[in-house]
């Protein structure tokens, strides 16, 4: 389909080079779908200019509000950056695209991955504790939201927005994984 895209998120200016590198990797492997980038008002004009200079179309979205309890929980765990990645949820609302393959901006694409567009909605990568042999990750079976295949649906997006408040009172991680795994 013509309206399929790779999508990434620029959650802070610090990841600008990662977005540019991701685009160059996709071009190097001759990906047939364009890369677009979600940004919000916290991204500087300079970072947006770098994206434009490198031919990366950016899409401005409002900041998704998350409860203070989640923000504080993430900061205490030393993962305050997780508070910005809720912006990924916008991909579920972007019905102008028939399918989105979401890639974190720090993903290294080594070969063409266009076949991901043939995968069904909510195909996600599982963290690879056994492959990497990291003992503290043993038994981890939840999704890694760094690579996802999404068929956008406004109703699903609205339901996910409701889940954010629900998860504020739960003793979980306060991550996008909590929201997606509950669907």
Describe the function of each predicted region.
Residues 1-183:
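Glycosyltransferase catalytic domains, chiefly GT-A lineage
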